[in-house]
Regions:
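Extracytosolic ligand-binding ectodomains
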Residues: 5-12, 22-390
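N-terminal secretory signal peptides that target proteins for export/translocation
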Residues: 1-2
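N-terminal signal peptide c-region/cleavage motif recognized by signal peptidases
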Residues: 17-19
Length: 390
């Protein structure tokens, strides 16, 4: 066989393999390896892969395998838009998992609307970010909606909430929104007198001055608007200075390892969550598999977070939408199939997710149960449960 013929046959074989590859159903993914919420993002991809493996193990979608293509945003909004465009235009993804933060969603959702591709966040919770867009969805609940349940639970438990103060980071969108809008508004609605607030930067290591100011205010509760890392440092400094006020927060601090890492300094802290593994056998099975894979990857996790569960569910939502819309992955039908995924998700009712039955509201946010958790000695205890939409 001459070299030209051999080359022709190799090229022909490569081309023959292309259609099968092209029929893989591609999901884009926008993880954040840096930024104020990097610890929350670190294990989300493992959760997504569990869902992919489960779907593919039973034949995929009409015989077509699902797979994930990732682009790391490093927590930067401009890179999130670059990533979305690459995944949509170069990689021909049918839909996108993420981004994680509200700052990223602010720019990704309008970009996704222009392109015509669904992007679904597993963690963004700043109020009304998805509402103006048809392709922007969030498998999260509004922080105001969740924090109302925290305050209601505190009232029902008769925990002291007569006076409150607030500590929040000013250098990321959701922390600032929590500190300036969500926490003070809902605390006041609940009859709590807000006596003052302090601010800090996410990367600030020394929070002694802020803790001293909070000590002087001497309030029953201290609302925290930040990611997990500064919340840990603040709790430790408050207890070092002898401040006994109960810490309360939204889901922005909801790292599954938070209780273990803070230890006794966090005793009494109350936050909302949308995932509690004790809610079902399905949720427990997911967490067991998740912990096994996390350990195999050399990461330190003793439990799955609500953002891990939300990421798993996003993949399952997309699989459901692809089945219902009879998606093929055909490049010639890409725009129509992306829109069909959007329309199916928006019409979805009470999908049996890990977190409970989930639908999407008109504002693009998931309607899901809220679990109110209290920290004690390195563990989370369930103290309140609110069904979806209650």
């Amino acid at each position: 066989m001459n070299s030209k013929l051999a080359g022709f046959l190799v090229a022909s074989a490569a081309l023959a393999g292309t259609p099968a590859q092209a029929q893989d159903l591609r999901l884009g993914y926008l993880p954040s390896s840096a930024g104020p919420f990097a610890t929350l993002s670190r294990t989300n991809e493992i959760a997504a892969q569990i869902a992919i493996d489960e779907i593919n193990a039973v034949g995929g979608i009409a015989g077509r395998k699902m797979r994930i293509i990732s682009f790391d945003t490093a927590g930067k909004p401009d890179q999130a838009v670059v990533g979305l465009r690459k995944l949509a235009e170069d990689d021909k993804a049918l839909a996108v998992i993420g981004p994680l933060s509200s700052a990223e969603c602010r720019v990704v959702f309008p970009a996704g609307e222009r392109i015509g591709i669904v992007a679904m966040s597993m963690a963004s919770s700043a109020p009304k970010l998805a509402e103006p867009f048809t392709y922007g969805l969030r498998n999260t609940s509004d922080e105001g909606y969740m924090f109302q349940r925290v305050m209601k639970t505190l009232q029902e438990k008769k925990y002291p909430i007569a006076t409150g103060s607030i500590a929040y980071a000013t250098d990321d969108v959701i922390s600032k929104t929590m500190g300036e809008a969500v926490l003070p508004s809902i605390m006041k609605q609940s009859g709590t007198e807000v006596k003052g607030s302090v601010t800090f930067q996410t990367q600030a290591f020394d929070l002694a001055a802020q803790a001293s100011q909070l000590k002087a205010l001497a309030t029953d509760v201290i609302g925290v608007g930040s990611g997990p890392e500064p919340a840990i440092r603040l709790a430790q400094e408050l207890r070092r200075q002898g401040v006994s006020g109960r810490l309360i927060a939204g889901s922005t601090v909801g790292d599954s390892e938070l209780a273990r890492r803070i230890g006794a300094d966090g005793n009494g802290t109350v936050i909302p969550g949308t995932f509690y593994p004790g809610v079902s056998g399905k949720a427990q099975k997911f967490e067991e598999e998740f912990i096994k894979r996390v350990k195999a990857a050399g990461l330190e996790r003793s439990a799955a977070s609500q953002f891990d569960a939300a990421t798993y569910d996003i993949v399952q939502f997309y699989a459901y939408a692809m089945k219902e819309a009879k998606v093929t992955g055909d490049a010639a039908r890409l725009a129509d199939e992306r829109t069909a995924i959007r329309d199916t998700l928006r019409a979805m009712k009470s999908y049996p997710a890990l977190e409970g039955p989930i639908s999407f509201g008109k504002n693009g946010d998931a309607l899901k149960p809220v679990y109110v958790l209290e920290m004690q000695n390195g563990h989370w205890n369930l103290i309140g449960t609110y069904p979806a939409g209650s």
